Amino acid sequence: MRSLEDIAEFLNTNGWNYTVFLMCYEGPSSLHADLDSAVGRLVGSEVVVEDLGQVEEAELLAEVASCLSFVGSDGEGVEPQLVESGEFRSLLIGVMNDAKHLASRASTIRRLRILEGHPAYPVFWEFAFLFTASSKLILFIGSSSD
């Protein structure tokens, strides 16, 4: 999703000692696959995940917005004025609209925690949501590190 690339580029360019990873993986669902196998197939490596339960769209949007708006402190993060800028707000609206679109197509949204095999290196924040839609799975994942 272009909105993920755009906001990650903005945060990575304007942050210090701070790297943002955002990705959306999509693939066919398998009725017989366990959660670890299904998510592992999406990210392309073995993973161990914790299922934190089903969530509603509002919870998804609140968590993603909170994570992406992380300011940090001296030495890491993004300057507060950048997170308050019109450019950031516009980029965040794009991500929120894309997340709403994913949620509208999903029969379920599950919050996950990737315990092993995370495709990035989470330090400051992380999120992972698995959307089940018809015959496919969509994993919306984000994290930040130093």
Region locations from a protein language model:
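N-terminal "domain-start" segment
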Residues: 1-86
